[in-house]
Regions:
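Periplasmic alpha-helical coiled-coil/stalk elements that build and connect Gram-negative outer-membrane
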Residues: 6, 31, 139-254, 358-361, ...
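Bacterial N-terminal signal peptides
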Residues: 9-23
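Acidic, low-complexity, intrinsically disordered peripheral segments
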Residues: 26, 225, 413-451
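Bacterial Sec-pathway N-terminal export signals of envelope proteins
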Residues: 26-77, 83, 108, 225, ...
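Small/polar (Gly/Ser/Thr/Ala-rich) solvent-exposed segments
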Residues: 48, 71-95, 106-135, 263, ...
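Amphipathic alpha-helical coiled-coil segments
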Residues: 49-64, 136-160, 170, 177, ...
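Hydrophobic, lipid-facing positions within transmembrane beta-strands of outer-membrane proteins
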Residues: 99-105, 251, 310-316
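Short, charged, amphipathic alpha-helical segments
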Residues: 123, 186-195, 397-405
């Protein structure tokens, strides 16, 4: 018979194992920035929409190519007459019924070759859609990065708020003890309780903001269920070290050659020029070539029945007057060409401003980071010193509240500066058009190291 102690030990072990398994099963998934990039590229509806646009343009090229090939069609006919009819001589002029079938091969082309222009436009449109897809992916990755760092900032904000509540709780308890022994007045305790209540409300607000930012990130990436974020060394692989320069001109030159939006508009300019040429082709005549094989059978056969015939035809169509339609279409195509040129120049100016703004933001964040780190160190030392002075009656409640406020402000500003500095680097990568290339290159390097 088993001893009761052994049975109890087995039961406790079973419960612990079960609890551990359930905890690991329902534990929140952890994602790094690398993981979020991969998931976003796979699940994003916006990226999939852009991929469908690319698929549509590829099919448009197939349709433009199909126009260049002749069309082969078959036809057939069966006719039942009320009766056959004959001449007085007995010759049949209307059969009882007849059947016919045949094959038709025809091709229509404009002398201007506008069908070839349409095929050329369709090929250029594919390249444009590829650049558009690249730009969508890159912009989406930056959106993921921004949401990722928003969550990390709010996590730190929650930690700061919790630490603030703990400090103020200790201060309130210390104030309560000193009130009991008569060292300080009750107003000091009331002030401490008021500050603690405010800190607790800030903690609730920070926790709610954290939940909101996590929901936004989950929506952008396509995550389901609860999750946590982790900062890994691989995340820093996406942060190149920019040298502080006097101007942002080198970055602008890179953007002019790398930005997918600019490449897309450059192709759009070519398409607009080809579209004008395509529309002008309406002034040229269209030539149609047709070849037909025809077979007919009648019962009873008429005297003029030709059972088989093969013939070809050539037709030239030249529209002389269409109410000014062709001229209006050419003018419209030219106007669209001018629009594309204006959009292209406007995009260049916008990119230059984006570079300037991102570069100055990067310089600002990098410049203030060291100062805020020093300020945080001083604020911590100051709070520790004032706390000790308060314990010995050398500082009052206002002094410790001021020291605590300075510490909380320094912590928040330092955390914001750390993550804003990282995001400013990614923003520079985005506005120069190198973010997606950098991400894919780093992911390839990381995967090769894992293998």
């Amino acid at each position: 018979m088993l001893k009761p102690k052994f049975i109890i030990a087995v039961c406790i072990t079973t419960v612990l194992i079960t609890f551990t398994l359930l905890k690991s099963l329902y534990a929140a998934e952890e994602y790094s920035l690398t993981d979020l990039y991969k998931i976003a590229l796979e699940r994003s509806e916006r990226i999939k929409l852009s991929e469908e646009d690319l698929y549509i343009t590829e099919n448009t090229k197939d349709k433009a190519l199909a126009v260049l090939f002749p069309r082969l069609s078959a036809f057939g006919n069966y006719t039942q007459y009320s009766e056959d009819k004959r001449l007085p001589t007995g010759a049949i002029i209307q059969p009882d019924h007849s059947t016919s079938w045949g094959l038709s091969l025809n091709q229509s082309l404009s002398i201007s070759g506008r069908e070839f222009d349409a095929f050329k436009i369709s090929k250029e449109d594919i390249k444009k859609s590829q650049y558009d897809l690249y730009a969508v992916r890159e912009e989406y990755l930056f959106g993921v990065s921004s949401a990722y760092y928003d969550v990390l900032k709010m996590k730190k904000a929650v930690d700061i708020a919790k630490a603030n509540v703990e400090r103020l709780t200790k201060h309130k308890d210390a104030a309560a003890i000193r009130v009991k022994v008569g060292e300080i007045t009750k107003t000091v305790l009331l002030r401490a309780e008021a500050e603690l209540s405010g800190a607790q409300s800030e903690l609730i607000r920070a926790e709610n903001n954290l939940s909101l930012t996590k929901a936004v990130l989950a929506r952008i990436v396509g995550l389901t269920g609860d999750y946590e974020l982790k900062e890994t060394p691989e995340d820093d692989e996406y942060l190149p070290d920019y040298k502080m320069e006097d101007t942002s001109n080198p970055l602008k030159e890179v953007a002019m050659s790398e930005r997918a939006e600019l490449k897309s508009l450059d192709i759009q300019k070519k398409i607009a020029g080809d579209q004008v040429k395509y529309t002008r082709g309406l002034y040229w005549p269209t030539i149609s070539i047709e070849g037909i094989y025809f077979n007919k059978d009648e019962e009873p056969a008429t005297a003029f029945l030709i059972k088989e015939s093969t013939y070809a035809g050539l037709k030239l169509i030249f529209p002389f007057f269409e109410g000014g339609l062709r001229r209006a279409e050419v003018m419209e195509a030219k106007a669209k060409q001018r629009q594309v040129n204006l959009i292209y120049e406007d995009m260049k100016k916008k990119i230059n401003i984006d570079i300037e703004q991102a570069y100055l933001d990067y310089k600002t964040q990098k410049g203030v980071l060291k100062s805020l780190r020093d300020r945080l160190t001083f604020a911590k030392d100051n709070y520790s010193a004032v706390s000790r002075q308060f314990e010995f009656g050398l500082a009052n409640s206002i002094d410790i509240m001021d020291a605590n406020t300075l510490l909380v402000t320094a912590e928040r500003q330092f955390v914001d500066a750390v993550y804003n500095q990282r995001l400013s680097i990614l923003r520079l990568e985005r506005v120069t058009g190198r973010l997606l290339k950098s991400v894919t290159a780093k992911e390839t390097a990381i995967n090769s190291q894992d293998e």
